A protein has these predicted regions:
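Beta/alpha (TIM)-barrel catalytic core signal, keyed to glycine-rich beta->alpha loops juxtaposed to Asp/Glu
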Residues: 1-179
Length: 179
């Protein structure tokens, strides 16, 4: 968290980290990198979590120009936690935006974590409904489950065997699912 740092100290440390990642990209060890937000989407205005992604993108531009390798923003997003699409917590060029809108404006790809609300979503929603919800707004979705039956169902649904899914709707729009 930023709790023990001033704003300037935090962004100075981010610049050091971005320089390190850009070096690894230049060396061919990685192609792209990003940042993951733990509670920022749930508590978007809490100073200890809040990060201006435009400022991070500007640091990447300062370090490596427009062809920098800062590409991904990962955050919690699911049918029971839609704040990334409903709360205008980011400022881009003086305009208030949601996290998802800001990522799009900065040409950053969004990665949804916890699309099943840590399993709580299964108590209220069908798998296909939860996948459909996240895939409409996100570029990528990281899925997983401790339950082998859920993993099997996820794979069947994602491959298009909708008759085997527990839900009614078809999900679409997401380029990648990583399991």
């Amino acid at each position: 968290t930023k709790l023990k740092l001033t704003e300037d100290e935090f962004y100075e440390k981010m610049e050091m980290l971005i320089r390190w990642y850009e070096t690894k990209c230049f060396e061919g060890k990685i192609r792209y990198y990003g940042i993951a937000f733990e509670f920022m989407v749930e508590e978007p205005f809490e100073n200890k979590w809040h990060i201006e992604i435009e400022r991070i993108k500007n640091i990447a531009r300062k370090v490596s120009g427009e062809k920098n390798h800062f590409k991904y923003i990962l955050f919690e997003y699911h049918i029971m936690c839609d704040w990334a699409d409903t709360v205008k917590s980011q400022m881009i060029d003086g305009v208030k935006m949601t996290m998802i809108e800001a990522c799009k404006a900065l040409e950053l790809e969004t990665v949804a974590s916890m699309p099943f609300a840590m399993g709580d979503g299964f108590k209220k929603y069908a798998l296909s409904d939860m996948l459909d919800f996240v895939s409409k707004k996100m570029n990528h979705v990281i899925v997983g489950s401790k339950n082998p039956k859920h993993i099997e169902e996820i794979l069947r649904c994602w491959r298009g065997n909708l008759s085997e899914c527990s839900g009614r709707q078809r999900f679409s729009g997401t380029d990648l699912v990583e399991i």
